[in-house]
């Protein structure tokens, strides 16, 4: 098994790591073309994405003597360990050093002694074949002098897995599990869209725990859904103690969100669910798998309120968060692009904090919000049957997977608002 095979997905990053390894194994071929081996590699990304695994795969494939430094001592003891490790690496050169969680080396955000020490150690081995790998959760917290070329020539941003990577990671873990045959990996990837690698692994393991406790021979969709909701989103799938009226209103609200997003950007809803955040509560949310343009995003945010008001004939409550988010998006749009012409656009480069300026922006914002609310209600009114079926399906199943939503929406031809 190749060392890089331990990295599931992330093909572009693997290619970059393999190129560095190739330079280590074939230095003469690169030197013949005047290429110099980079002095360092920085892997930057939030926790739980497998940065350390990637670094260790490169270290293993290189076949070089490798040394690792982690912050687990007092400042004085740590600085001594750092210097000793670089000294050992220099004596064993060609070699590699892994500075794991380097942004955690400093215990005080105002202290740079540890980072200065790293710079000094790297400069001391400048003329020796010592390759330094560092993993960080946020490179913005590091001094610019440490990140300059000549120290960390290569910087790789490690993002959360995209849908393809998530499917590959899920497929890898399911090789060790017994999933029900009707579970589609694509649906699981949509359930876990935007999740970190650690969250993927934790949710899949939790699903197996639930299945075993239920004395089930396979892991069902319900087990996976429960695991994702509790492990990743920290909500309960149990809404049985909530009032029926609350359940119906929540289903209607979420159905509005789904309908508008699918009508304006087909295939964008990853999954939708009804859940509970507190005892006797019923709420819900939908997750999207792609970016939306501003207008689609605003109308989707207003769709829950609009769907409930169309159905119940009264002002919907509990939609303040959606309204605030929609207003924030419209405000950014108005202040940078304008609404009609350049009305409201900041063309001077200076913020107008006067009462007149604030009143003008507020007037434009309210007018735009009302316009989008009316437009959203028109679209939902023209597609009432779709909203009704989505609401009924949510009440029945509580969670609609991506395939469920596509199956329902595929039976309807979108009716444009008049």
Kindly label every feature range from the protein language model.
Residues 2-189:
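Walker A/P-loop NTP-binding motif of AAA+ ATPase domains
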Residues 227-231:
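Terminal C-lobe "cap" of eukaryotic-type protein kinase domains
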Residues 101, 223, 404:
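Ca2+-coordinating acidic residues in Ca2+-binding motifs
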Residues 17, 42, 59, 118, ...:
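Residue-level signature of catalytic and energy-coupling elements of molecular machines
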Residues 131, 144, 159-225, 301-309, ...:
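Conserved C-terminal "switch" segment of AAA+ ATPases
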Residues 9-13, 114, 196-200, 248-251, ...:
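An acidic site on a long C-lobe helix of protein kinase domains
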Residues 46, 249-252, 258-418:
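Soluble catalytic regions of large protease machineries
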Residues 237-250:
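Short pre-active-site segment immediately N-terminal to the catalytic Zn-binding motif
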């Amino acid at each position: 098994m190749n060392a890089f095979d331990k990295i599931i997905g992330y093909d572009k990053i693997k290619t970059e790591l393999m190129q560095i390894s190739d330079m280590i194994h074939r230095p003469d071929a690169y030197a013949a073309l005047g290429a110099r081996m980079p002095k360092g590699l920085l892997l930057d990304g939030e926790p739980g994405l497998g940065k350390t695994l990637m670094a260790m795969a490169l270290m293993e494939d290189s076949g070089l003597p490798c040394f690792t430094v982690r912050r687990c001592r007092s400042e004085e003891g740590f600085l001594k360990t750092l210097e000793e490790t670089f000294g050992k690496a220099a004596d064993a050169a060609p070699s590699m050093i892994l500075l794991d969680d380097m942004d955690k080396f400093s215990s005080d955000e105002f202290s740079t002694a540890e980072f200065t020490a790293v710079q000094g150690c790297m400069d001391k081995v400048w003329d020796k074949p010592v390759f330094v790998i560092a993993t960080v959760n946020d490179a913005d917290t590091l001094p610019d002098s440490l990140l300059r070329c000549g120290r960390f020539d290569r910087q790789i941003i490690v993002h959360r897995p995209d849908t393809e990577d998530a499917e590959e990671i899920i497929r890898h873990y399911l090789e060790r599990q017994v999933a029900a045959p009707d579970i589609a990996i694509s649906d699981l990837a949509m359930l876990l869209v935007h999740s970190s690698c650690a969250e993927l692994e934790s949710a899949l393991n939790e699903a197996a725990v639930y299945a075993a406790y239920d004395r089930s021979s396979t892991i069902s969709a319900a087990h996976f859904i429960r695991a994702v909701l509790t492990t990743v989103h920290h909500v309960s799938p149990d809404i049985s103690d909530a009032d029926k009226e609350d359940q119906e209103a929540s289903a209607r609200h979420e159905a509005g969100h789904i309908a508008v997003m699918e009508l304006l950007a087909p295939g964008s809803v990853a999954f939708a669910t009804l859940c509970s955040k507190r005892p006797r509560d019923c709420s819900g949310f939908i997750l999207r798998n792609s970016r939306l343009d501003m207008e689609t995003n605003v109308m989707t945010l207003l769709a829950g309120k609009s769907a409930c008001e169309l159905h119940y004939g009264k002002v919907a409550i509990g939609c303040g968060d959606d309204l605030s988010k929609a207003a924030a998006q419209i405000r950014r749009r108005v202040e940078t692009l304008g609404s009609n012409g350049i009305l409201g656009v900041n063309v001077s480069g200076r913020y107008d904090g006067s009462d007149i300026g604030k009143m003008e922006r507020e007037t434009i914002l309210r007018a735009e919000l009302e316009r989008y609310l009316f437009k959203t209600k028109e679209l939902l009114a023209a597609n009432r049957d779709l909203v009704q079926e989505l609401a009924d399906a949510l009440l029945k199943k509580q969670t609609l997977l991506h395939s469920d939503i596509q199956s329902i929406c595929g039976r309807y031809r979108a009716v444009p608002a008049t």
